[in-house]
Structure formats: C-alpha cells, structure tokens
A protein has these predicted regions:
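Residues lining hydrophobic/aromatic ligand-binding pockets adjacent to catalytic sites
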Residues: 1-292
Length: 292
C-alpha cells in the first residue's frame, strides 16, 4: 500500500467489538487477521505493560497483509527513568525483545511520558540521545507523547528535530495538542469518540480529521489512531476516516472463512464490514475508563 496515510485503532482484542466490528462467530485467533484487512495500522498497547518474544512479533507480521503497520507503545518503565544509565537499560531492553521481527511492518514507537513529566531541556536531551536510529539494520521512528503543558515549547520541538523524532499529536482536552512538522512522519491519537455517534464522531469531525491528515501527508507519512473515548466505536471511526480519504485496505474477502475458523473458499464473496451498532454495548472489564 503506497498511501501516505494509515488509519487504525488501539489493539484488536476488545469484547464489545464482537458486536460492533467483528463478524459473528469470528474466533479470537482470527481477529488481527480480520482487523488488518479493514484497517491499515494498529497501535499495540500490550507492549506498554509486557514484553514479548520475537516469535510473537513474527506471528503478528505474518497474520497481516502487505502494507499494514504496527505502532508499538514502549514499556511504561522506559519513560520514568531519571539517569542516563537507567534510561539506556530500559530503552535497550524494550528495543531488544524482538520487535524487529515485524520487519517492514514496524511503524512508529510511541514513548509515552506521564503527565507529571515537565519539560526540562537537559532531561529530554538525555532521553532522546539514547534512542537509536536503527535496530538490526531496520530504521526506527520515534514519537514522544507528552502530557504536561510545559512541553508545548519551541525548545522541545527543536530537540525533536535534532534527534529525528516527533511528538504525538493527542486530541484530548486534558492534554496539550502539540504539532511538529519537522519530522518525515506524524502520529495522531484521537481520543474523544462518543458512544451516541454510530461512527464515534460526527461527520463534521471526520471531515476535519481528513483535511488535517491530507495536509500533513503533503510532506509526511501520517499515522492516525482512534484511541480511548467510546472505544467500542473506534473501528467505525477509523473506517469512516479511511472512506473519506479514499483509502482501500486489503480485502477481507476471506472473512467468511475466518468467521467459522475454516479455510476460505478458493473464490469467496467479499463481505462488507458489519455496520456499527446504534446500541451501546455494556461496559466490560476489558473496557477501561482510564485514558491510555
């Protein structure tokens, strides 16, 4: 896929999506395969809490079509270290677990900092200097997600440019909305979907996102993720944005076979994505209220 804009959601396993996104009867083991044929990227939140073996990353890679990409959230401990030595140890541990098994499907790495981390030039200079530009000969793209308003500072953007990194644009009223045009890629996390909107957002909002992404894509590769908010609506939001942008993901023609856990027929009929339910599913234990 050569389109400069990729659109996705956070993860692929979320119980309410069984009603609003996945076809009836689709096995859990086939959810990534299905999602990757309806969307063009996904943000992996599980790497924020746990480490995985190279075989797991390779399995994810093999389950998805050409052009699909994974954005990984770096482990939460890697952005709370205070000394150069501890930073390097945590960063190396995360990058060394086997993420390069994703190969060309490895997208931006999101280094998410806590809201308490204020902008201090020396601190961020030290952190950014520990981020390698490649791993196992695979280029790495680093995006810092900051949640303290003091980071909305030109000096912060200068540091990012110096180290070929960018800042995550987080659309949420609780966090600063910082835009950086100095990198060759951009990452946006849209976090305000509403349960009373079948597509999570109004048509006007989807149109606005499309205009912004199109403008950014004139000079950058763009990754847009619908995260948190009314999470049950996020796949519908992502597909609505893709439709507005004219993005056509890999076909899900084999979805019928996936739904039954069987091999697809030689020439299966293409299935349409299930329509977003207008009924809000009950919140489950897998539907966290905390913003990620």
């Amino acid at each position: 896929m050569s389109h400069p804009i990729r659109v996705g959601v956070g993860g692929w396993s979320f119980e309410p999506w069984d009603e609003t996104f996945y076809p009836p009867g689709l096995s859990k083991s086939k959810q990534l395969e299905y999602a990757s044929r309806k969307l063009t990227a996904v943000e992996v939140n599980a790497t924020y809490y746990s480490s995985f073996k190279p075989d797991t990353f390779a399995k994810w890679r093999d389950a998805t079509p050409d052009g699909f990409m994974f954005s990984l959230k770096a482990h939460r401990f890697s952005t709370v270290r205070k000394t150069r030595e501890d930073m390097k140890k945590s960063i190396d541990l995360f990058l060394g677990q086997g993420i390069t098994a994703l190969k060309e499907k490895l997208g931006p790495i999101n280094w998410q900092f806590p809201p308490t981390r204020k902008f201090e030039k020396e601190y961020f200079e030290m952190f950014l200097s520990q981020l390698p530009k490649e791993k196992d000969k695979l280029p790495l793209r680093h995006a810092l997600e900051v949640r303290n308003p003091t980071c909305d500072d030109p000096a912060f953007l200068e540091l990012l440019s110096k180290h070929d990194a960018t800042v995550v644009y987080a659309e949420d009223d609780d966090f600063p909305k910082i835009r950086h045009s100095g990198a060759d890629f951009a990452v946006a996390r849209l976090m305000q979907s509403k349960s009373d909107q079948p597509n999570g957002y109004s048509k006007a909002d989807i149109d606005r996102f499309a205009r912004t992404a199109t403008d950014w894509a004139k000079k950058q590769d763009v990754f847009v993720f619908f995260i948190s908010g009314a999470k049950e609506r996020n796949p519908a939001a992502a597909m609505a944005l893709q439709a507005k942008l004219g993005i056509t993901p890999a076909t899900a023609a084999e979805a019928g076979g996936m739904a039954a856990g069987k091999k697809a027929a030689a020439k299966p009929a293409a299935k349409k994505a299930p329509k977003a339910s207008t009924k809000t599913p009950a919140r489950t234990s897998s539907s966290p209220k905390k913003k990620k």
